[in-house]
């Protein structure tokens, strides 16, 4: 069984990485990988415009920076958390209880022959 030198293995890995770096720097690595940053930038711009549409209170027609858009999103999320943390208001007359058919007066109960809505 042969023993491998850990130093030599690291050296080969570094050489391989530096050769790839030089190839990319010289432009030999252009292709889908070179187009990736542009598509990512387009995706991020789309996300910022989508956030701008979704958050209420962002004035239309004014130019906001990405930081300002994010700050408005954060403020909106905090406002939603405050609203959700508040107890839900109860009905003003007290709690609603289900009404049984037997508790209704006879004129309010619809008989089976009157349930037809068509003439």
UniProtKB/Swiss-Prot annotation:
- Where would I find the bHLH domain in this sequence? 28-80
GO CC terms on record? cytoplasm; nucleoplasm; nucleus
The record's annotation in SMART domains points to:
HLH (SM00353)
The induction comment states: By phorbol 12-myristate 13-acetate (PMA).
| Keywords recorded for this protein, A-Z | Biological rhythms, Myogenesis, Nucleus, Repressor, Transcription, Transcription regulation
Q: Which Pfam families match?
A: HLH
Q: Report the InterPro entries cross-referenced here.
A: bHLH_dom, DNA-bd_prot-inh, HLH_DNA-bd_sf
GO MF annotation list: bHLH transcription factor binding; leptomycin B binding; protein dimerization activity; protein domain specific binding; transcription corepressor activity; transcription regulator inhibitor activity
Kindly list the biological process annotations in GO that this record carries: cellular response to leptomycin B; central nervous system development; circadian rhythm; epithelial cell differentiation; heart development; metanephros development; muscle organ development; negative regulation of DNA-binding transcription factor activity
Recorded superkingdom: Eukaryota
Segments crossing the lipid bilayer: none
Protein purpose = Transcriptional regulator (lacking a basic DNA binding domain) which negatively regulates the basic helix-loop-helix (bHLH) transcription factors by forming heterodimers and inhibiting their DNA binding and transcriptional activity. Implicated in regulating a variety of cellular processes, including cellular growth, senescence, differentiation, apoptosis, angiogenesis, and neoplastic transformation. Involved in myogenesis by inhibiting skeletal muscle and cardiac myocyte differentiation and promoting muscle precursor cells proliferation.
Protein's UniProt name: DNA-binding protein inhibitor ID-3
Origin species, per record, is Homo sapiens
């Amino acid at each position: 069984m042969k023993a491998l030198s850990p130093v030599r293995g690291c050296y080969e890995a570094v050489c391989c990485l530096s050769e790839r770096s030089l190839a990319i720097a010289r432009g030999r690595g252009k292709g889908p990988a070179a187009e990736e940053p542009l598509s990512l930038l387009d995706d991020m711009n789309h996300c910022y415009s989508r956030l701008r549409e979704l958050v209420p209170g962002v004035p239309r027609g004014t130019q906001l920076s990405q930081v300002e858009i994010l700050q408005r999103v954060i403020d909106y999320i905090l406002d939603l958390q405050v609203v959700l943390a508040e107890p839900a208001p109860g009905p003003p007359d007290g709690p609603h209880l289900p009404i049984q058919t037997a508790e209704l007066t006879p004129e309010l109960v619809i008989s089976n022959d009157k349930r037809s809505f068509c003439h």
